[in-house]
Amino acid sequence: MKPGSKNSFKSLRQISINGKNYKYFSLKEAEKNGLDGISKLPKSIKVLLENLLRYEDDLTVSKKQIEAIKDWLKTKKSETEIAYRPARVLLQDYTGIPAVADLAAMREAVKEKNKDPNPINPLSSVDLVI
């Protein structure tokens, strides 16, 4: 199952701009389809909610995590750990170079076992600034 393939709250929408189609997750639609009251969430929490909707797959992001955001409105606290998956990661050289070295070492170890090293990649796009 690929990320975002669940769409439990039927929030996936499409918009056409200059003849090109773009998909997005509508918080208004999610609110209509079970996430009551989310329009009252602070903007920072809405960003987290949109990210959860985008990556819901029942493996890394579950419906329970999404509902925990809605439930936060009642109690202003939650014991549920939620996933956050940024679209892009920016690394400076102090953190980026060791990460690249780790990836290279993992690829080399996999290659030595006669396996395909190509799947060993970051889940998110990464920019390394040196």
Protein language model annotation of sequence segments:
Residues M1-I130:
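Fe-S-dependent hydro-lyases/dehydratases of central metabolism
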